[in-house]
């Protein structure tokens, strides 16, 4: 697979599979960071998290789980802007939470409306990192420690 023309490159994995006529279950991608071939479960996670395919020298690349977690943390430390509560975020953007793209700060999955509502209900903040809003998905959510 080689795409020299940027205008012809599919940036979502299902579109790439369709373009090259390969099943999602058969496509092979390398990691953009460590260059290791993605495991099948990482390919499925890539689709589930609605991540974009990147290209280096015309070759499509994804991201493996360890690199995704590592570089998400690096991005959090280097590109942090601010933290706000749900109501404040709605006021800042003039949009309802359900209409704002908020990704999990750890795994990068887009948050569903219930996950966004959980932040509001539990009085947790959303974080602006590299001008994108993040929170925590259900899978990555860690409840705060309670003293018994």
UniProtKB/Swiss-Prot annotation:
Keyword DNA-binding on entry: yes
Start and end residues, zinc fingers (unnamed): 31-67, 104-140
Signal peptide: none
Keywords: Activator, DNA-binding, Early protein, Host cytoplasm, Host nucleus, Host-virus interaction, Inhibition of host innate immune response by virus, Inhibition of host IRF3 by virus, Inhibition of host RLR pathway by virus, Metal-binding, Modulation of host cell apoptosis by virus, Oncogene, Transcription, Transcription regulation, Viral immunoevasion, Zinc, Zinc-finger
GO MF assignments: DNA binding; PDZ domain binding; zinc ion binding
Pfam families from the UniProt entry: E6
Gene Ontology cellular component annotations, sorted alphabetically: host cell cytoplasm; host cell nucleus
Keyword Cell inner membrane: no
Motif PDZ-binding domain, residue numbers: 146-148
Subcellular location: Host cytoplasm; Host nucleus
Biological-process GO terms, alphabetical: DNA-templated transcription; regulation of DNA-templated transcription; symbiont-mediated perturbation of host apoptosis; symbiont-mediated perturbation of host ubiquitin-like protein modification; symbiont-mediated suppression of host cytoplasmic pattern recognition receptor signaling pathway via inhibition of IRF3 activity; symbiont-mediated suppression of host type I interferon-mediated signaling pathway
Domain of life assignment: Viruses
Main location: host cell
Task performed by this protein: Plays a major role in the induction and maintenance of cellular transformation. Acts mainly as an oncoprotein by stimulating the destruction of many host cell key regulatory proteins. E6 associates with host UBE3A/E6-AP ubiquitin-protein ligase, and inactivates tumor suppressors TP53 and TP73 by targeting them to the 26S proteasome for degradation. In turn, DNA damage and chromosomal instabilities increase and lead to cell proliferation and cancer development.
Subunit-level organization: Forms homodimers. Interacts with ubiquitin-protein ligase UBE3A/E6-AP and thus forms a complex with human TP53. Interacts with human NFX1 and MAGI3. Interacts with human IRF3; this interaction inhibits the establishment of antiviral state. Interacts with human TYK2; this interaction inhibits JAK-STAT activation by interferon alpha. Interacts with host DLG1; this interaction leads to the proteasomal degradation of DLG1.
Other remarks on this protein: Belongs to the high risk human alphapapillomavirus family. The cancer-causing human papillomavirus E6 protein has a unique carboxy terminal PDZ domain containing substrate.
Family assignment from sequence similarity: Belongs to the papillomaviridae E6 protein family.
Protein name: Protein E6
Gene name per UniProt: E6
């Amino acid at each position: 697979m080689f795409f020299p023309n940027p205008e012809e490159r599919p940036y979502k994995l299902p579109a790439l599979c369709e373009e090259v006529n390969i099943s999602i279950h058969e496509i092979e991608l390398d990691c953009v960071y460590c260059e290791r071939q993605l495991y099948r479960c990482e390919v499925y996670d890539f689709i589930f998290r609605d991540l974009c395919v990147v290209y280096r020298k015309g070759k499509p690349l994804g991201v493996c789980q360890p690199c995704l977690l590592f570089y998400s943390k690096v991005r959090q430390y280097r590109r942090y802007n601010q933290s706000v509560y749900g109501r404040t975020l709605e006021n800042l953007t003039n949009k309802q939470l359900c209409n704002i793209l908020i990704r999990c700060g750890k795994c990068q999955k887009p948050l569903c409306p219930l996950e966004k509502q959980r932040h509001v209900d539990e009085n947790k903040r959303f974080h602006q990192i590299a001008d994108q809003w993040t929170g925590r998905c259900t899978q990555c959510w860690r409840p705060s420690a309670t003293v018994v």
